[in-house]
Amino acid sequence: MRLRWMRRLGVALAGLAVLGVPGGATSSANGALPADQIVFMVDVGGGLIPPVVYAMESPALVMYGDGRILSIVKDNTTGAVPARYELSRVDPIAVAAFVSAVQERGIVNSAEDFGMPGVTDMDATTVLVHGEGAPAKVGVYAFYESFDKGLTVEQQRARATLRQVIDAAYNLAAVGTRAPYTPDRIAVFDVGTESSSQSASTPWPGPPPAGFLKPDP
C-alpha cells in the first residue's frame, strides 16, 4: 500500500513539474492557503440538455485550501440523478504548490484564446484558480480533443496546456486518502410552470397502468 501511495505522489509531483514549478514551492508565508477557500475548481455544464439534467449539474472537481478535494465518481448515470462524490484529503502544502504552479503558468487567464470549435449545442468547461490575490477563471467551449481540429496551433496548445492542469489536479486528488462523500445539505431547484399553460401535473390519459404493467417474471 505504501508503494502505491508513493507512486501516486510521484505522479502528482511530476504533474507540478510539467506546470513549471518545483513540487516544494508554496504560495503563502505559512505554506498553506485559507482552509475554506476554493482554490481550484473544474465545472462542466451547459449545452443542449433537459431542464432536469441542468438542475442536477455540479462541479466535476473542487479543491480547498486545507487539502480537501471533492471529485465526481464517474458512472453510467445519465445526469438525471445527483452526482456521487469522493472526498480526498491531501497535504495543504501540496495544494498550495499546485495552485502556485497553475498561477505561474498563466493558462487560467480570461485573455487566453482557446478557440471556438464550429459545433453547436455543446457544453463548456470552466476552470477557476484562487491562490493569493484575486481569483481567475476561464471558460472553454466544446473542450474535447475531437473538436480541436480546425483551431489554430496556438489555440490547440492552450487547450492542451489546460488539460495538463486539470489532469494534475486529478492526480493530486489520487494521492490522498479517499472516501465516499456524504453531503450535509441539499438544494432544491424549482423549474416552475409560469411559462406553460399546463398545470404542474397532468392526469394520466391512458388506461389504468395496472391493466398493462406486469412485473418481470
What residue spans do the PLM features occupy?
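Short, structured motif recognition centered on aromatic/hydrophobic residues
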Residues: L61, F98, V102, V127
